[in-house]
Amino acid sequence: MIDIDRPKLEGSVAVGEGRRIGFAEFGSATGRAVFWLHGTPGARRQIPLEARTYAERNDIRIIGLDRPGVGSSTPYSYPNVLSFADDLATVADTLGIDRFAVIGLSGGGPYALAVARAMPERVVVTGILGGVAPTMGPDAIDGGAMVLGKFLAPMLPVIGAPIGRVLSSFVRVARPIAEPAIAIYGRLSPAADRELLQRPEFKAMFLDDLLNGGRKQMEAPFADVVVFARDWGFAVGDITGPVRWWHGDRDHIIPHTHGEHMVHLLPDAKLFTMAGESHLGGLGMAVDIITELMAVWDQEQPLIPR
């Protein structure tokens, strides 16, 4: 296992109603800001080491955010996906960030789109990596993991918390065997994801993220599923800013057709198909993804310094 540096800055921000949202910063403290929204499950450190190094060298400030119940974030149930945007806005204000890009991986995708919808004047560009699509309403599409999620969603407000507590307890007890557990998950994954999880730097990142995700981290994914299965609170087609979407054509969790569907709905979007890649493919292309988003930033806001 390789060594992994701590974030440049790590803490939490008060977002109202007695709640806090945890964050971790990587890269340059004065560079262009990129909010990175983790997958389901995940936490604030679920950011590839290559992306952190690239950000440091290219004057980019990456901020990973915990969702409610993860890390130092207060447990909370959003009424819909759009409600998350208020919390991110408060974090951005507190950290002195005006304009920014936002990246959402998998379950972070809906929240990234919500931020783009709620703050078009602040979000310069949005990147989605294998993002979840709506399951109800005019923007809905069937298939993938959310078929089961939609079925379970009505029960999760009751059973999700106790199941999550058991799983979180297992994570704490299993710290000495966390690395073998990640290896086992990799062996059960499709070839592309398995190869990524065998790379020492990604194994180290996932292990670090898992062990710093807090004592309730396994309850939070159930809250994600519940809110994903509802009306999101906005129409995908109302997002006016540029969106760049990366999706593996062998994604076994969120099918590639979901990416095609979402890009068709978005007014200003481009789909990058990752040939031969599965659900985690975007993590292995993090530098290319950030480079693309910064190029769009240059086109959209050429006078804003890095």
What do the predicted segments below correspond to?
Residues 83-101:
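Conserved acidic catalytic loop of the alpha/beta-hydrolase fold
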Residues 239, 245-247, 251:
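Short beta-strand/loop motif that positions the catalytic acidic residue
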Residues 219, 249-254:
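Acidic catalytic loop of the alpha/beta-hydrolase fold
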Residues 19-72:
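Conserved HGGG/HGGXW glycine-rich cap/lid loop of the alpha/beta-hydrolase fold
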